Amino acid sequence: MLSWALIFFIIAIIAAAFGFGGIAVAAAGIAKILFFLFLVMFVIFLIMGLLGRRGPPPV
């Protein structure tokens, strides 16, 4: 259990170093762009899926 605590402590220190530096701002900007990109893709595929359902295929 102590090893897990040490691993998470190291991860927290690395995250703090990134957070207090300027990397967090750049990462947040990239995350916003990716969020809207995948949101648009989701809406497009949702519409395509709803329009593509025309009933069961003929047998």
Swiss-Prot record:
Name assigned to this protein: UPF0391 membrane protein lpg2521
Highest taxon of source: Bacteria
Membership in a protein family: Belongs to the UPF0391 family.
The keyword rRNA-binding belongs to this UniProt entry's keyword annotation: no
Subcellular location: Cell membrane
Xref: HAMAP family: UPF0391
UniProt GO cellular component terms: plasma membrane
Membrane topology, record value: Multi-pass membrane protein
Chief place where the protein resides: membrane
Entry-linked Pfam families: DUF1328
Transmembrane segments: 5-25, 30-50
Keywords, sorted A to Z: Cell membrane, Membrane, Transmembrane, Transmembrane helix
